[in-house]
């Protein structure tokens, strides 16, 4: 299950999406997520899925690989679904179980929230899979650069966010190694109910934290050895600049938003 995590990983390639400016990809990802959260019906989510599928095909990413990235988050998605189903108020009852009444409005809201989480993860995964860590850092820094007038540490924050994002697959890989090592010594992580399996994961925490701090210390020493001093007077190997590909991406996103808006007006 851990190997299915796609968030934070980079998939090298030379597609149109890979060659786009990281600033534009960040902006378009945010706009896409906001657009998805504005959708209020199933046809709108079908449009969002179709648009995402086209982007994935253009970027050369395996769509099945992206879908598998949802698997490790199925418990969070299921928990969100059940929470909204049980506690969201509604007026059209569908089923009564004791003192709990399930309504049509609650069912719709639960489905919509679950779909939003799925599109949030998949959209963010497309961004990280098509953008290298260095490009992501430069893009975040350039987008936040106007805040430097207020003494905001744009470069440092961008670096922290990128390192944290890139640490996700590393920590998951380390967890998988530790789990396999303990299973070779007789540990059982697969039998029993969900609570028992959760308790069996507790012995993984200590070696995982030790490994995480060791990696963080190694990274800090490597940056110190290279005389890293933050973003002041920092040069770049490749300067960022917008191209026709970015204009094409912005136009495609505008078309997506127009379709979402028109569909909402027609069915709303």
Whereabouts are the PLM-identified features?
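Membrane-helix interfacial "entry" motifs
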Residues: 14, 37, 60-65, 97, ...
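Alpha-helical transmembrane segments and their helix-start/interface "positive-inside/aromatic belt" motifs
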Residues: 25-26, 64-74, 249
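Alpha-helical transmembrane segments and their membrane-interface exit regions
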Residues: 51-61, 76-79
């Amino acid at each position: 299950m851990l190997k299915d995590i796609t968030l934070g990983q980079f998939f090298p390639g030379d597609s149109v999406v890979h060659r786009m400016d990281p600033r534009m990809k960040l902006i378009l990802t945010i706009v896409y997520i906001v657009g998805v959260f504005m959708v209020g019906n199933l046809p709108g989510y079908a449009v969002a899925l179709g648009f995402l599928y086209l982007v994935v095909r253009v970027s050369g990413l395996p769509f099945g690989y992206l879908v598998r990235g949802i698997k490790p988050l199925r418990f969070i998605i299921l928990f969100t679904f059940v929470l909204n189903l049980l506690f969201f108020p509604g007026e059209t009852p569908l089923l009564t179980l004791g003192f709990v009444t399930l309504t049509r409005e609650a069912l719709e809201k639960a489905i919509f929230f679950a779909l939003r989480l799925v599109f949030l993860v998949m959209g963010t995964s497309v961004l990280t899979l098509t953008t290298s860590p260095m490009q992501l850092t430069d893009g975040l820094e350039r987008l936040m650069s106007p805040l430097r007038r207020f003494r905001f540490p744009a470069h440092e924050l961008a670096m922290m966010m990128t390192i944290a994002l890139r640490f996700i697959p590393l920590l998951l890989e380390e967890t998988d190694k530790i789990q396999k090592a303990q299973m070779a010594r007789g540990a059982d992580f697969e039998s029993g109910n969900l609570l028992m399996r959760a308790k069996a994961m507790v012995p993984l925490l200590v070696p995982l934290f030790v490994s995480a701090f060791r990696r963080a210390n190694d990274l800090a020493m490597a940056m110190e050895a290279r005389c890293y001093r933050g973003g002041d007077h920092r040069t770049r190997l490749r300067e960022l600049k917008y191209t026709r590909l970015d204009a094409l991406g912005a136009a495609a996103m505008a078309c997506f938003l127009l379709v979402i808006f028109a569909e909402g007006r027609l069915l709303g």
